[in-house]
Amino acid sequence: MEIRQLQYFVESARTRSFSQAARTLYTSQPNDSKAIQQLETELDTVLFTRSSGGIELTEEGKIVYLYAVNILQNVDRMNELLEERRQTHPISD
């Protein structure tokens, strides 16, 4: 599982559209869909129901969404803390 897969998944769930998520994340829709399919394969579950009207989270997808949002928030916070640390404690040779 990769962070980018979780980003695509969360944005797709928020927008209910793979193509809109791809635009928001400055990627291509085929890459977005492939990342979601890989995530579904890895988790051995279907995360979205797909129809001509768009996409909807499955019950399993709703569970994954809650955890994915939390994971991404924690990654963002970790990066913020590390950046603060670099500013106050620069690495010296």
Where are these regions (language model features)?
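Alpha-helical residues within the helix-turn-helix
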Residues: 23-24, 41, 62
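Helix-turn-helix DNA-binding elements, focusing on the entry/boundary residues of the two helices
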Residues: 17-18, 36, 50
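A short LG(V/I)-centered, amphipathic sequence patch enriched
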Residues: 40-57
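Interdomain hinge and pocket-entrance segments immediately C-terminal to HTH DNA-binding domains
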Residues: 84-93
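Short helix-boundary/capping micro-motifs
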Residues: 12-28
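Short alpha-helical "packing" element that flanks the helix-turn-helix/winged-helix DNA-binding module
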Residues: 8-12, 64
